Amino acid sequence: MACVNEPSPKLQKLDRNGIHGDSSPSPFFKVKKLSEKAVIPTRGSPLSAGYDLSSAVDSKVPARGKALIPTDLSIAVPEGTYARIAPRSGLAWKHSIDVGAGVIDADYRGPVGVILFNHSDADFEVKFGDRIAQLIIEKIVTPDVVEVDDLDETVRGDGGFGSTGV
């Protein structure tokens, strides 16, 4: 059994700056444990889009309520990306648990917390180590904003909210 503090064969431990002899931005998803209760995110399978985020505490999400669940992690995602916290399908389907406010910008270095919403009529118990959400790293485009007098015409025009069918 491997020591908990040792990186797994697939995880690389980087120096403080994440640089290995060059100054190019690191392509790695960097994770810092803020306590011994933090669980390093993992993917459920080689083709999984999301990294599972785990609770660092025992907690409760009240019926029809919400709770902020700490992960005791800080992260750094590659430049040109952001991290999105998304629901886990099993929690959504079986327990009516959803997540909110799930954007983590590439320059944020604070603790990662997960806002859980309970849409059911029963309290939802969260235990230390439970996988509560998934973190998906997505590429982002941030073009300059240009104010214009008119927008280009399209077939759809200003039709919204069901205008293309139900």
Curated annotation (Swiss-Prot):
It comes from the Eukaryota. It holds the Pfam family dUTPase. Binds 1 Mg(2+) per trimer. Silencing of DUT leads to high seedling mortality and affects plant growth and flower organ morphology in surviving plants. Its cofactor is Mg(2+). Coiled coil: none annotated. This is Deoxyuridine 5'-triphosphate nucleotidohydrolase. Homotrimer. This enzyme is involved in nucleotide metabolism: it produces dUMP, the immediate precursor of thymidine nucleotides and it decreases the intracellular concentration of dUTP, preventing uracil incorporation into DNA. Keywords: Hydrolase, Magnesium, Metal-binding, Nucleotide metabolism. Residues 1-24 are annotated as: Disordered. It catalyses: dUTP + H2O = dUMP + diphosphate + H(+). GO terms for molecular function: dUTP diphosphatase activity; identical protein binding; magnesium ion binding. It comes from Arabidopsis thaliana (Mouse-ear cress). Mg(2+) binds at residue 138. Belongs to the dUTPase family.
